[in-house]
Amino acid sequence: MLNFASRASCVTRRQASLYFVKNQGPRLIASTIPSCHWPLRAQGVQPNYPLSLRFYSTDKSKSVTKPVAPTSTDAPAKPKETLMVKVKHALKHYANGTKLLGYEIKVSTKLLIKFAQGYELSRRERNQLRRTMGDVFRLIPFSAFLIIPFAELFLPFALKLFPNLLPSTYESGKDKQAKRNKLIEIRKKTSEFLHETLEESNLITYNTIENAEKKQKFLNFFRKLYSAKEGKIMTFQHDEISAIAQMFKNDSVLDNLSRPQLAAMSKFMSLRPFGNDNMLRYQIRSKLKDIMNDDKTIDYEGVESLSQEELYQACVSRGMKAYGVSKEDLVDNLKVWLELRLRQKIPSVLMVLSSTFTFGGLPKENYSKAFSPLAEKKETKSKYDDLLDLYYDGILQVLSSIPDPVYNVAKLDVSESKSSAAETEAEKQVAEKKIKTEEKPEETAIPKEEATAKESVIATTASAVTPKLVVVNEKAETAKTEEISQEKENAEPTDSAEATEAEEKKTSDDNEFKLNVLKEQEELIKKEEEEAKQRASREHVPDDINLDEEEEAKSVPPIPADQAAKTFVIKKD
């Protein structure tokens, strides 16, 4: 019964399908009927096709689904721009750039007149004037392509070879983005290279500083840094790191870096590594000098006064990651830089080298060896505190991987500063002793003068009294007066001889002192001349930029503009 029912159902289904095919047009029949049965099509005979068996799986654990062809819901691809459209866009871009350049020249002329009249320009106005002057000077070689006939045909090739030939107003957004991506890649590569080279250099071991006694603070820090206990991670406070970092001068660190390290550092600072080692050092020094001056102006005007683009440029020039970073993070990074540079007096070279370790920003899970006791007391640490710990950790990594020459130079500087302080104290003591010895003969000379004055007073009183007395024996008195006069005459040359001897001694002592001073000065001049000859033989590029701030200049930084007094008093005559 089951087979009959299933067979009947199959017949009815087949008849229905044949009926559907029969009632369709010849197009459908030709497409559904094989070619071997086409002769029967004219007679209206339709062949009976056996239906294929269908098997269904009884396993319900796996659901077999046929792949469905994806429906194309994506937007249609944009057609490529034609040559005329590209030319129109280029002409419009250069027209807008020309208008912008003219407007900047107009504004910069007013700023130049303001500066010529003696007014002080702000940081934004100074950058505007500098950028416009650079664009105007770039127009000089660019004008040659406009003056020379048919030279504009070679302009695309010239721009390909020299991309900075055009002023900054003609730079497109794609070019800016390409420069940013290239700068990020270069900084990543150079930071990795600096890490490897600093780690491969000869580090300081415990044996090299074991016998030192005078530089306790300096050597204890490195002893703690390189002799970590087993199972414990040594931590350092911010005060310890800043105190040791201040001992490494900018010039001493730069002078002892190798050629590959200088080239990588110049690339990291967006400088071209062209020339010998002295030229690279000169370029890095001049760039750092500009950054140091810019730090003071930003600190005075306030970080909040900068726009988004100005914050981006300031962070990029200092080696920070700025692309894709929010404005709040840029402000925090710049505040941390100013705190370490101006308040803590950390050298700029160490700051740039530490930025190679902190280029990626704050990691998600970080453990810092540097901590601040003030920040630890807070319940919730701010992002500023985390960034401060990150930068101190970067400085600590730079100090832990400093080569031997830099360490030895810093160690000598510390010992020389201590020995010079001891020498100055000894010189002061010797000078005080000389002053005391000079004061003693003056004190002894004062009683002699007083005694002679008393004798003269007594003699005058005696001469005044003698006329009143009764003279009995005039001869005896005259004899006594003659004897007294002779004694006085004999006493006067002795006193004059003693005075001349004392004066000769004083003059001889002064002359000897002056001669000694002149001899010392001549020796110092000879040493300086020898050192100058050695420097002239070594160095070919004059480098007179000194990045180390003087001790006298280590005063309180200027008061920011927002904290300054809003009123002032003018004294009237």
Curated annotation (Swiss-Prot):
Mitochondrial intermembrane side of membrane: 57-138
Transmembrane residue ranges: 139-159
Positions with biased composition (Basic and acidic residues): 425-453, 477-491, 502-543
Gene Ontology annotations of biological process type: intracellular potassium ion homeostasis; positive regulation of mitochondrial translation; potassium ion transport; protein insertion into mitochondrial inner membrane from matrix; proton transmembrane transport
Membrane topology: Single-pass membrane protein
Presequence range in chain numbering: 1-56
Molecular-function GO term, any one: mitochondrial ribosome binding
InterPro entries documented for this protein: LETM1-like_RBD, LETM1/MDM38-like
Notes concerning its domains: The matrix-exposed C-terminus contains a 14-3-3-like domain which is necessary and sufficient for interaction with mitochondrial ribosomes.
Assembly notes: Interacts with MBA1. Binds to mitoribosomes in order to recruit them to the mitochondrial inner membrane.
Task of the protein: Involved in mitochondrial potassium homeostasis through the mitochondrial K(+)/H(+) exchange regulation. With MBA1, plays a role in ribosomal translation and protein insertion into the inner membrane.
Name this polypeptide is given: Mitochondrial distribution and morphology protein 38
Organism expressing this protein natively: Saccharomyces cerevisiae (strain ATCC 204508 / S288c)
